[in-house]
Amino acid sequence: NFVGSLMEEGEDLWIGTSSGLYIYDRSDDHFLYFDKTTKYGVFISCEVKKIVKTKNGLIWIATLGQGIFIYDPVKDVLTQNSIRTFFAWDICQGTDSLVYVSSMQEGLLCFDEQGTFLQSYPVSFELKIGNQRINCLHSIDHEIWCGVGTNSLGCYQEGSQELKIYNT
């Protein structure tokens, strides 16, 4: 297993690996495999690229192969959203409280805080930039910045209808 993502939550360190999710309890010096399943019996078994806790307390998990998972620690419920993409690369929450997910195929995806899909912002094939994958996300002052392909930068202005691409 290689570690690809980390998130701190109280005394716990959530660890995204090449084969699932683990939690390290620092107070007990103990590792646990995150074995929660969805109501359909699905558990996180593939590469975890990003783990983010949103303002409402839900934990969003981006995977390469199983899409997005959302864990509610209060209700102890895990849900999976793979309808829009199986290959989620990164997650960030904007200043508008919406959750943005980068996809290897579908561009920038936008969800409300509960996980309801709102809209996608695809990378235009007309730009002829080759690789259409959105690699990483970062929220800065009402803008969602992203790495696109191998030589491009994208910017989505919260509330707008398009993802602008800048060639580097």
Question: Which stretches of residues belong to each language-model region?
Answer:
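Carboxylate-rich, polar loop motifs that coordinate divalent cations or form catalytic acidic clusters
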Residues: N1-T168
